[in-house]
């Protein structure tokens, strides 16, 4: 368990993150450690969220299946909605009910990420839980580059407000 704590990043009071795998090409070797991590987190945490890429192996499928909430994240990229739809279908096939999935549109308000684009993403996902995270701009990029996620979420910016609201909504849904 000390290794689990050492591999984490505390981003806000009561909110801790793990991942990603340092060497993605070795992700399949992480299946058992991910299962062990999830076992510990289930005992020690109130809620476990799993956020993955669109590339799934056994470790990702097991993590998603064991999670309380699956965040399907997309943005204004051309293939984002299609990729998100595929991930939702895959998650459904490994046993995750759609009620445990949330469509998260990232960088809302950035250039090219307006209301129409966000709505197209949400319609493609066809999930009842929809979240929009406002664009954080260069200020967010600078804070994250120095590992200061807790400070970024604590600000009075549109980004910070949207993250706090999204977290509140997800916790209420659980």
Language-model segment annotations:
Residues 43, 56-78:
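Inter-motif core of Ras-like GTPase G domains
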Residues 74-76, 90, 101-113, 132-138:
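G-domain G4 guanine-recognition motif of GTPases
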Residues 84-100:
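Conserved C-terminal guanine-recognition region of P-loop GTPase G domains, centered on the G4
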């Amino acid at each position: 368990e000390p290794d689990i704590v050492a591999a984490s990043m505390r981003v806000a009071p009561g909110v801790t993150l793990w991942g990603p795998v340092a060497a993605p090409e070795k992700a399949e070797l992480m299946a058992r450690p991910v299962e062990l991590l999830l076992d510990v987190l289930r005992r020690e945490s109130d809620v476990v969220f799993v956020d993955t890429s669109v590339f799934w192996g056994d470790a990702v499928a097991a993590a998603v299946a064991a999670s309380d909430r699956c965040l399907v994240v997309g943005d204004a990229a051309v293939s984002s909605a299609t990729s998100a739809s595929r991930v939702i279908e895959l998650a459904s096939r490994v046993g995750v009910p759609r009620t445990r999935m949330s469509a998260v549109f990232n960088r809302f308000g950035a250039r090219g990420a307006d209301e129409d684009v966000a709505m197209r993403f949400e319609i493609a996902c066809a999930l009842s839980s929809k979240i929009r995270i406002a664009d954080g701009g260069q200020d967010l990029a600078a804070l994250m580059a120095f590992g200061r996620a807790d400070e970024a979420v604590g600000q009075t910016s549109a980004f910070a407000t949207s993250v706090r609201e999204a977290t509140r909504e997800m916790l209420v849904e659980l």
